[in-house]
Amino acid sequence: MDRSLGSLKIELREFYFEASEGSIHEMIWTDMFRKICMDVAQLSALQGAGGWLYRFDLAPSLPETKHFGATHSSEMAFTFNAFGNPDTPSRIFHDRRDPVVKDLALKWSGTLIEFVRSGDPNGAGLPEWRMYDDSRSCLILDEYCYIADDPDKRHREFWTAVN
């Protein structure tokens, strides 16, 4: 469907009704990044290669980063469990003394180690993580980790409609 920029702007404003004029671009970029991740997972599943999808939702807990919300790449310190090393060169957005941070860092890094070791990411303390399929299952990493089916449905359907 062809749309003028004016009509697309109206649709975006209606969809992101909670966004301020200054933050709508951030929401659009976040959604587009998520859409690409979902598209890659979908294509991998369709081609038989398979894959897993996760979303990192744990908001930063340091005073200077609390206002960011869960940002792109903030999970990297969890991936490499950088919280145990006070001299880490990693950018850290979370309080290394927080028990939730410590626990998630151990479980997430352990999950990735298990995946590299065996080809299966399960067994390191997180919920049973299914391969991406028609249910669009996604591991949500947060204070409490869980599996959600199609957690970005509203956004996915909107971006499919406007493309």
Summary of predicted features, one role per range:
Residues 1-2, 101, 158-163:
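Generic hydrophobic, helix-prone segments enriched in Leu/Val/Ile
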Residues 1-99, 111, 118:
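Substrate-gating cap/lid region and adjacent catalytic-acid/histidine neighborhood
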Residues 41, 69-74, 138-150:
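Short, charged low-complexity intrinsically disordered segments located at boundaries
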Residues 57-59, 119-144:
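Polar, surface-exposed loop/tail segments
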Residues 71, 106, 131-133:
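A structural signal for short secondary-structure junctions
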Residues 144-163:
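Tryptophan-rich aromatic "cage" segments
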